[in-house]
Amino acid sequence: MEGIIIKGIGGFYYIKTDEGIIECKARGKFRYNSLKPMVGDRVTIKVENGKGVIEDIHERSSELIRPTVANVTQAFVVFAIKNPDINLDLLNRFLTLCEYNDIHAVVCLNKEDLCTEEEKENLKELINDIGYEVLFINAKEGKGFDALKERLEHNITVLCGPSGAGKSTLLNAFIDREHMETGSVSEKIGRGKHTTRHSELIDVDNGYLVDTPGFTTLDVTFIDRDSLKYCFPEFNDYNNLCKFNGCNHYKEPKCAVKEAVEEGKINKLRYEFYIKTLEEIINRRGN
């Protein structure tokens, strides 16, 4: 029997299967192989004498550390438009981490009622130009909720963003609506409002939402200096057009990315953020 781990606590794992949620323990072989089951893992289980056992952990497509979740495919990067104002460097940092982890990012701009249509259009154009979809939402009023739900299907989605952006409000709105639609809360896993410290997957419209914020640490200096450029999708059309193989678009001559910046084809502020991050990596790692 196959399923997905939606919660793990105290050595027990709760597996969502076609036959319902089954409480399992892991085989001892995983400890010997230093492989610990994670929320989000797709697994093969066996029920013996009424007790479930995890027999196999399927290959992971991704693995986050904070929160500890496997196979995340999508991130809702939640920022407030106002109160506080958008910090573009911080937004870029979240987007860089999403790209590094091969996670599709959707930028969700909350408190959309606090800005003009012109301001929204300018922000949308800015973010679209660097390769990301933008959704305008109002987490308290539920505006934009249906558009978010559409994007949850067939994904494991994590919410990330700075404090005060509305992540908890949005998350609790998803949890409350899911409870109303299903009519009950699973007593076995004890799901309630967003109070648990243990990561859990919320089943929403043929997809899953991680109930703890993603990327709670924003350090990017672990990224290899030669890999950073691949975290900027707007560089993709130019990476192979530079004179030198392996060009990092830094101090190298005849660089196609730098030329694209000068021609206005790549956003100058994004490129400056890239250089600042690259120098941070070089200075931190001494290479």
Swiss-Prot record:
Domain of life of the source: Bacteria
Pfam families named among the record's database cross-references: RsgA_GTPase, RsgA_N
SUPFAM superfamilies (UniProt xref): Nucleic acid-binding proteins, P-loop containing nucleoside triphosphate hydrolases
UniProt binding sites for GTP: 110-113, 161-169
Cofactor binding mode and count: Binds 1 zinc ion per subunit.
Keywords tagged on the record: Cytoplasm, GTP-binding, Hydrolase, Metal-binding, Nucleotide-binding, Ribosome biogenesis, RNA-binding, rRNA-binding, Zinc
Protein residues bound to Zn(2+): 242, 247, 249, 255
EC numbers: 3.6.1.-
Residues covered by the CP-type G domain: 61-218
Gene Ontology CC: one annotated term: cytoplasm
CC cofactor: Zn(2+)
InterPro entries the UniProt entry points to: G_CP_dom, NA-bd_OB-fold, P-loop_NTPase, Ribosome_biogen_GTPase_RsgA, RsgA_GTPase_dom, RsgA_N
Main location (coarse class): cytoplasm
Subcellular location: Cytoplasm
Example of a GO biological process term: ribosomal small subunit biogenesis
GO-annotated molecular function: GTP binding; GTPase activity; metal ion binding; rRNA binding
The protein's assembly and partners: Monomer. Associates with 30S ribosomal subunit, binds 16S rRNA.
Role this protein plays: One of several proteins that assist in the late maturation steps of the functional core of the 30S ribosomal subunit. Helps release RbfA from mature subunits. May play a role in the assembly of ribosomal proteins into the subunit. Circularly permuted GTPase that catalyzes slow GTP hydrolysis, GTPase activity is stimulated by the 30S ribosomal subunit.
Family: Belongs to the TRAFAC class YlqF/YawG GTPase family. RsgA subfamily.
Name of this protein: Small ribosomal subunit biogenesis GTPase RsgA
Originating species: Clostridium perfringens (strain SM101 / Type A)
